[in-house]
Each structure stands twice: as structure tokens, then as C-alpha cells.
Amino acid sequence: MNELRPNIIFVLLDGSRVDRLRISAEFNELIKDGTLLDNVTSAMPYTFGAINVILTGQYGKENGVDGYYKVAGLKNNILFLPEVLQQNGYFTSRGLLNDKILSPRGFDIRKEFNEYEEDLNTKHPELIKETYKKAKGKPFFTFLQFSRIHTVTVTDVLKKFEWDDKKFYNNKKNNLKTYDKVFREAGIYAKKIRNIVDELGISDNTILIFFTDHGTGIGERFGERNYGSFTYEETIRTFYHFIGPKIKKNSKSESLLSAVDIFPTILDLCRIPVKEKQPGKSFAEFLTSATKLENNKFTFSETGALHGPYSSPEISNVFCIKSSRYKLIFLKDVDEWRLFDLMNDPKEVENILGNELPIENELRKKLLQWINR
């Protein structure tokens, strides 16, 4: 029944780092309003790949967007969240920095906002109002991309430093200051989006989801100026924060999840069943009840960089498998493996490959199976 289905406002805080959420007073206020999941593995730590995985519930090999240069490759036979919602009575809209980064399937309204010239603090609330009005009582889905972190990264980093310029990597302290400043802007923006829901009087039937597609490096890894070159925690560990009338408040989970879990979760929250088999699993019950959220046994991530020592924009060549404690990274082009104990070495500094840990062979076998599926 359409009248019982919630509105969904899906807000991408593009490039946000899990470990810097605390520096925004506004975002910390929002955290108290809902449930934060802060250990969700990005399937591809760059926007094109990441959002297609999120909105299809399928990895890149299956959905067709498995490389930087395959942005338009979404397969027609793959379920696409806005289209599924539209077919089930939703009015849908989106506001992106570039309309070409995502398939038009299933969207009633598509807006493109110039990241250098337009104020998203104004434009996005206006789009929510327009969507609500044009929905005419139907439930609505709005996907918003807050791109300020991306804008600053491109302007202050990519346009100033080549990937092998040591000046950038030797300036991590200032890089972090730059990042923190723009993330505070993201927190202010997020609060404005929360406020517009209250202003419209729709908070009783609206689920707000603030999330990131990937993190942003500040020079931790030589060869990665921002994201997409490797699969370390600063770029693949992401968060999703759910706020809604039935969502638990002031709740947090560090359980290991995957980006492929988001698609079935949103459909569950909207009470829309799908018959197609999904690699992910819904955690909607955890969001709305006292049930425990179990760790995924393993999660997977992959990338192929535009720049850097292992550039491969056509197809992924860096892969990783992650458990609740360990991560194994495979650099395919140079046939190099790196194993990290995330509990004792959260910054992934010491490669413990070859220390005869039983988990090493299990992770290697599972990762190769996933790559060659």
C-alpha cells in the first residue's frame, strides 16, 4: 500500500571519511537522531562504481560498471533501485554534479548542479520541496550528491599535484586541516537537509539516509592523492546513518557490512519484495528493533585507478577481502599480496603476510574465488 510506504531521502556526502565524523558538531547532533553503521565496505572506492553497486545491490562485474571508463555500462537486465521504487508507486528525483555519472532509469526529475557555481545548501532543499510537491501524495525517493569534498579535493589536490609529487604526501597535517574544514561544511549541509524534512512536516513518514560512497586519502599512501588507487581503510570503510520514525535513536554499530547490503535493506524498509537473488542481505530489522547485527563473514572491494603506480581505468586490478579483523590486499599487476591485522594495526602499516596465520590461506582462496567468479 503506497500510503504506508516511507519517503526516502538518500544523501551522498561524497568522499567523507568515517574517522572524521566526530569533528562536525552538526553531524554529531544528527547521529543522536538515528542509527549509524560505520563499518560498511565500499565495493569500489570511486563514485561511478560505488553508487552503481549501492543502487543495484550487485558488484561491478555483474551490473556492468566495473571500471572508471564504464560509467554508462549499467546492464538493462539489472534491477536499479530508483526504477524498482518508481514501479512500486514512488515519485523519484535526483541532484548530481554531473547527470552522466548515473543511468537515467527510474527518475522522474533529474537535476545537474555545477559544483563550482551553485550552492547545494539552497539547491538541494529546493529539489526536495519540488519533489514533494510534484509527488502529489505519492511516496517519493530523492537521491542527492553533496560534492563539496570532491570539489575541494580536485581544486586543492588533483589540479596542484601529480600523483608522484612528494610535496603532497609530506604535507599530511595540512591536508587533514583542509579535509576537516570541508567536512564541517558537509555537516552543516546535512543539518539543513534534516531541517527541511521537519519544515515540510513529513518527518513522520520519511527515512533520511546520510552516507558516503568512499573515503578520501590525505597522503597516507604514496600514489593515492585522494581515492580509487588502493583499498585501504581510509577509502573503503564507509558509513550509513539512518534517521526515521521507526529507526532506533542514538544507536551505532561497527559490525562489518558491505555496500551490496544497502539495496535489499532499503527495499525492506519500503516493504517491496524482489524475487531476484542478491549477494547482499538486509539489515532493516536491526534498524527498527533490538536485534543484534552480525558481522558479514567477508566483504570485498576492488578498484582500477585513473592515476598512480598501478593505473587501470578500464578494469579493476587491485582487490581486497576483509573480515572483522583481517584484510588481504592483492595488487594483480605486480602479483603482490598484503595482509593486515586491523585490530592491532588499524592504520595498515605492517604487512604480516607470511607469518603462517591460518586466516591467510582462507582469505587468499576466497578472494581469488571472488575475482574469478
Each language-model region and where it sits:
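Catalytic domains that recognize anionic headgroups
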Residues: 1-373
